[in-house]
Amino acid sequence: MGAKITTKQDGSFMSLETDMVVVSASISEDNPDLKTARKLGIKVVKYSQILGSLMKEKRGIAISGTHGKTTTSAMISTILKTAGLDPTFVIGGEVPDIGGNAHLGKGNLFVAEACEYDRSFLNLTPQVGVITNIEEDHLDYYENIEKIINAFGDFASSISKDGLLVVNNHDDNVAVAVQRAYCKVETYSLDNSSDWYGEVLPVGSGIKRFRVFKKDKFFDEFILKIPGTHNVLNALAAIAVCTFIGVDKDSIKTALASFLGANRRFQIVGVRSGITVIDDYAHNPVKCAAAIASCQPLASKVVAWFQPHGYGPTRFLRAD
């Protein structure tokens, strides 16, 4: 495409020929490139604003939550692609099943992983939304859980009235946020208190087989190759969304049965001398616990190494 790539951030890459500078939420105002762009009068927009403007031209599906966003977004994109709908998608992780983390599709659907940091997800205009869970995260920006819940409430109210919001039914914080939704709401969980619920069946070897019920009526039976009960929950959200979109059951079943996950989301790096090495992006207490729990059925001994995901987030979560 002719794009020029540079790793320098000293302002030298900016020129008056630049039409627009797109910055992520993590770029601070003292960044040399950003300072130079502003000095030259170049238009500066946030990444989430660009994402929002692109979504306006299609039927938007936005997946939010403290954790599970990437996998759920990947599942939905994989299902839609399997169904021949050729969606546009932007996901926060590489997904081998669908050729990467982004794709400009010819279909009218746009799947986006909706990040809550800096309230970025409020720049999106989705017809369909998902909230997987709400927990303490990005405290360097939000300061407390109440402000996080409020932001998710704003997200819930942004879903178009003729759309659908799919939410985890066993999260008290989600229950507060979802009260501000103007659209239809469907819940999911692993018990029959929800609109969509899954019943995990014994299989072993990390494979998950589960029955799905919709409003107490049997819907179908599904298989997941990726381990972890949390991934059954992610799959339930994906099933609810894709059913609303109009995808047939067979396409959903085929896509989920072949789904291998996103890179660094419980990714098996290799096996040698009876040792399986797994790479997982887990970077807060709940995510770490879920990753370790997913390992336990696979081996009698689990050894974990933790790499802090930035100084600020780790400092706020050190007591946990």
Residue locations for each model-derived region?
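Glycine-rich, highly charged phosphate/nucleotide-binding loops
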Residues: 2-15
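Phosphate-binding loop of NTP-binding sites
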Residues: 12-18, 25-169, 173-182, 236, ...
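Short beta-strand/turn micro-motifs at beta-sheet edges
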Residues: 117-120, 199, 264-265
